[in-house]
C-alpha cells in the first residue's frame, strides 16, 4: 500500500482516509491481552493505533536484544495487521511517556554517554546502532512491504528542550534512509517554534484548547504541503505515587470538545493519548518532575478510555459514537474547504467554523460563554439548539448518507452503517428531546416501531419526527424505508443504547446492548404527500446493559507463607565474599550493576567512641541503614532525611546500606541523572529545611534581586508567615530567609524543590542561580560559593524571587557540610538485588514474627480463569517496596499510592500462586487479598 499526503489528508493508494488512532503500548500490556485490547480499539471506531518502542525494553543489556513475550514487537504488529488496524510507530530514541529514563537503557552510562538528546558523538554512536536494528524491524512491517505501519515519529517533543538542529537533521536522514513511508516530528508546545527540521511533517499535542496550537502548526509548516495532524490528544493523566496534583483526568465531554475543534480546523489525523491504559511493570516506572517523591505508579491509566483492567469507560463508549459520526461525514470533512462568509447562526455570541464541499456544509458551533445559549441555524431548514457553557456541536446540511438518500438537516447527531443491501441510520438523543430528520426523495415506508413516529411527505422529500423515550431499556423506534433497491433502516434510540451498538457487515448483523436487531417487517405503503402516524408493538431488548446486576466479585485472602526479615538478610550479606570497590559519583550501571538495588558497605575509623552525624547529600534515591545488625532507618531523599545518627566505637566501624534507586527521570533536564552514591558522605553537618517561617513581599511591577534588603516596596511591608504551596498571586512574590553559616562548615549547598515554578535565588544580594535552568530543571542543586557568603560569623540573607504563581513550590534546604568521611566503600549485589527466586530458596524463612525491613511471602489460589475478567491485589498494610508474582516483577508499591489496588495479569496467574513483597518502610508482616472480577456483559465483537 502506497502512502501519500497533501494539505487535506493522507491518501492510501489514492484514497483519502480520516485517521482516528489511539495509543496502545504493547510493552505495558500482557501479551495474552493484546488481541482483546486491539479489538476494543476497533469497537471504539479507531482505524489505527499508535505505540512507542522503548529502547530499554528491547536492549536492556548492551548488544543483547529482547523480542520475546511483551517485547514481541513484530508479533504485535502482525496482530494489528490481521485486525486491519494501521500503526503509527514511535521508536524514539527518547520517548515521553512516564517511562524510566525516557526509554534509554541504563547501560548508556557505562558506555560513557553524558549528553543525551544531543549531537554528542558518544551518544549518537549508541543511537545509530539502536536505530540500525529497530528501524530494520519497522521497515519490514511498513505499509509498502504489506505491513501495518504507515507513519513513524522521530524523537518526541523535542521543542521542550534546548535545540540541537544537527541532532534532529541526523535523525531525520537516518529515518528517511531506512523507511519508505512518511516520518514526522511531534510538538508539545508549538509556540516555542522549535523541535523539528524545516520542511518536515509536523504533529502537535493537544490538551483542552486546540485552536491556537493548530493555527501555530500551520504557520510552522509554511508553504510545505502537509495535512493537519493531532499526534497526541490528551485523554488521561499518568498517576504518580505521593503526588495527586495531576490526577484530574479528562472527561468525555472535554475530549469530545477537542475532537470537534480539531476536525473543524481540518485535522486529518487525530491520535488519542492514550486509548488503552497499561502497567509500568518491573523497574520501568519513570520519575516525575514534581519533587523528590514523585514517581510513576504501577498503574498507567489515569482515566484512559479503555482502563488498565480492560474495562470500557464512558470515554470509550462516547468515542465509539463520535467516531461513527465522523466516519459518516468523512469524505466531507476531508474534502471540504473552510468558508469565511457570514454564517446563518444566532446568537452572535457563538463561535462558528463552517466547512463546505459541493452542496454539503458542516457548521461547528462553540459556546465560549459561561451561560447556556439557545440558538438557531438555518440553511434550508431551521434547526433550533441549546448549547451548554463550553460545549461544541456540529450540524451537517445536504449530506449524502446512502446512494438514494440525502440528509437535508437533522436536529440530532447520527451515523450510518451499511450492511449488505441495507443501510442503517442510527439517531440518538437524550430522553424527552424531540427529533426532526429532514430527508430528500419520496420513499416507501416499511415499518416496525415501539412508539409514535410521524412521517410527513413534502415537496423536498420527507420529515421524520419522534420523541426520545425515557425508557432506556427499550428500543425506541425502528422505521424501515425502501429507496430503490436498498432498504434504509432508521433507529431512533437513546445515547446510552447507541453507545452499545456493534455491527458486523460481513454477516449483516446489528447488535444493540446484548440484543440482535430483528430485521423482519410488515409492508405498509405510503402514498406521495401522505402524512402517516406509525404506532406498532414495542420491541424490547433482551437485556439492559446499564441496569442488569453484575455477578458478585470473589475475594480471596492470601495466606501468609513466611517472613525473611532484616536479621536473616544481613547475615547473608555480611557472609558474602564478592564485595567489590564501589565508586562515589558513578551510576550503578557504570559499575556493572544491571539492577536498581545493591548492598553498599562503608568502613571507617573513629578516633573515639560516641555518636557520628553523617550527611548523605548524594544518595539516590534511598537506603535502609544497618549497624551491628540493627535497622537504623531509611536515609536519602525518600527516607526520613539526608542525615543519620550513628553510634560508633573507637576503631573500625561498619555501616551497611541497602541502596534502592527507586526510579529514573522520564524527562526534563534531570534525564540521565545517575543513581547510586553520587557525592561523598560527610562527617558532620546540618540540614536546614526551609518550609516555613518565610518573610515575603508582593509587588506588582518588576522585581530585582538586589532589592531584597529593602524594608518596604511599593508601600507594602514584609509579611511574616508560611509560604503556602498553593499561593496564587499576580505580579511577583519575594520570599527571604536569614541564616548563619556554622564555624565548622566546609561546604554549603542549596537544594531547591520548586517543580516548574519560575524563581531566582539570591544570596546576600547576588544571584546564585535560576530555576528552572536553561534545560528546564525541576530540581536544582546550587553550590553556595564562598564569595556569596559574608563574614562567616555574620547573618546572611537568602531571597527567592517568584515570577508568577508559586503553586508547585515545595521547599528548599541548606546543607552545611563538614569534612568528607574517610571511608572504604564497597558493594555487592546479593539476592536483595537479584531476582526474587533466590530469596524464595532461602532456608531462613520464618513462619511468624515481625521485622522492620525485608521480605514477606503469601500464597493464594485462583478460581477458574475462564470466568474471570480481571484480578486486583490489595495490600492494606504496605509501606513502600517491590512486588513479585510467580516470578514476574509487578513493580514498586507505595502506601501513598493512587488507587485501591494493583492489577494482576491473568496470564501470570497459576492455580496456586506465590506473592512476594519487599517491604522497606512499614514493617512486617503484611496482609493481602485478591479480588477476582467476573466476566459480565461482554461485547459481541465481530
Q: Model regions: which residues?
A:
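Short strand-turn-strand beta-turns centered on an Asx-Gly dipeptide
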Residues: 13, 380, 626-632, 762-769, ...
